[in-house]
Design a protein with these regions (language model features):
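Residue-level signal for alpha-helical context at structural boundaries
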Residues: 24-25, 187, 253, 272, ...
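Long, intrinsically disordered, low-complexity segments
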Residues: 32, 41, 73-136, 224, ...
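Active-site beta-strand/loop architecture of penicillin-binding DD-peptidases
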Residues: 190-233, 394
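Intrinsically disordered, low-complexity segments enriched in small/polar residues
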Residues: 64, 137, 180, 188, ...
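An aromatic- and glycine-enriched ligand-binding surface/loop that stacks and positions planar moieties
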Residues: 3, 10-195, 318-330
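Extended, hydrophobic/aromatic-rich amphipathic alpha-helical segments that build helical scaffolds
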Residues: 1-19, 44-59, 99-101, 161, ...
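Intrinsically disordered or highly flexible coil/loop and linker segments, enriched in small
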Residues: 178-182, 267-271, 296-300
Length: 395
């Protein structure tokens, strides 16, 4: 596990935030820049070589000693792939978990995690942009307009037994029509779970989606389960290795590492799934695919936010995020499952989808983004103690 942590640290050390031709922030104070505490003074490709070497040493040691490996599905169904992914991130004592955080033993009546109470009030609500990152079940990139036209946004005919997307989507985001308490969850406006949450941009389904990863069907569904917060899994090791290979001009091997992670959930390889892209020759395109794979595989595992920072992705910080307003388009209205059987009518299978810019929880950095925000400020009182701590640039 120490070798795996070394790889993760060297990935950050080699990334653009610290390792670039220019410092990430040129505003005063610049003492930390001049002292090379937040910038190496230039781009150093040898740092990517060091990361690659650490990855190679890790996998060589793994080949000799064994034990750690990706959790694999026991079948080729969406449920089997979901079960493998669930075991990898959620259950203790699996072959994939390298480093984890454990605070308490099990959920019980007096040991609720406070984060679980934030979810019903809109905490951790997924966005449209995140939903769109998950590919189709075949591996091809998701196309919103095509999904609307084919009526297969999440399932065929809103049947949770016929999923159309990456199995990790359903294990990460609660989407309309997903199986929930033995029935289809109703996230359309007026639905059983979503009376007005999306239309008012408040509550658990403010964006038209709900959180599923770690939260499952609510705190009650987690009772008496062991708690597991993964910090580093084998899937991330393959993706770290892929990035290091790419930065050392080995795109073919990089793609092979990513494909190992995708194959675990039944997705085709990157090249087959992205025939409109030249992934072997376009390093920027391949880097985007690696970052997307990290977002889909490692959601809510403290990865995406720091990926955006270490790669200085001001473009992503400045991009306004959206939700998805879902309405029934079958002539019916309101909840279906909550009505008496003789008044339900046909099961809803057609919907109208309206994208909307999030306004109730808009972020300050969508406008006037400042690169100083990549690293937070140290408290002034701490800097003024005079023991050598220097303030980060721009603060």
């Amino acid at each position: 596990t120490a070798m795996s942590l070394k790889c993760k640290i060297l990935l950050l050390a080699a990334s653009h935030l610290l390792n670039d031709k220019e410092p990430y922030c040129t505003a005063e104070p610049q003492e930390a820049v001049i002292n090379h505490q937040v910038w190496y003074g230039g781009y150093k490709p040898e740092l990517w070589k060091a990361c690659l070497t650490a990855c190679e040493e890790f996998f060589q040691a793994l080949q000799v000693n064994g034990h750690y490996e990706l959790v694999q599905a026991v079948g080729d169904t969406n449920d089997a792939y979901r079960a493998a992914f669930n075991k990898a991130y959620f259950l203790r004592e699996n072959s994939e978990l390298l480093i984890s955080t454990r605070i308490i033993g099990k959920y019980n009546w007096d040991w609720w995690y406070y984060w679980g109470d934030w979810v019903p009030n809109g905490g951790y609500t997924p966005t449209l942009e995140y939903m769109e990152m998950f590919p189709m079940a075949t591996g091809e990139s998701f196309d919103f307009d095509k999904a609307v036209q084919n009526n297969n946004m999440f399932f065929e005919n809103n049947d949770y037994n016929k999923p159309t997307r990456d199995p990790r989507l359903y294990e990460t985001i609660l989407v309309n029509g997903a199986k929930w308490s033995g029935r289809s969850v109703e996230l359309w406006v007026g639905g059983r779970e979503n009376a007005n949450s999306t239309s008012t941009e408040t509550g658990q389904y403010a964006t038209g989606f709900g959180l599923y990863k770690f939260y499952k069907e609510g705190k009650g569904s987690l009772a008496n389960n062991y708690l597991e917060w993964p910090y580093l899994r084998m899937s991330e090791m393959y993706l770290i290795y892929a990035e290091a290979l790419l930065k050392n001009n080995q795109p073919k091997l990089a793609i092979e590492m990513v494909d190992k992670v995708r194959a675990r959930v039944g997705l085709k390889g990157l090249i087959e799934s992205n025939q409109d892209k030249n992934l072997l020759s376009d390093s920027n395109a391949l880097m985007e695919e690696i970052l997307r794979e990290r977002a889909c595989e490692l959601g809510l595992e403290d990865v995406r936010f720091f990926d955006m920072i270490r790669n200085k992705r001001a473009d992503l910080f400045e991009r306004p995020l959206h939700g998805l307003l879902i309405e029934r388009a079958d002539g019916g209205s309101g909840s279906w499952s909550d009505k008496p059987e003789d008044k339900r009518g046909p099961f809803p299978t057609k919907f109208k989808y309206t994208q909307f810019k999030i306004s109730n929880s808009a972020r300050a950095w969508w406008t006037n983004f400042n690169s100083k925000w990549y690293l937070s400020a140290f408290p002034v009182n701490e800097v003024n103690k005079g023991y050598g701590l220097t303030q980060n640039p721009g603060w």
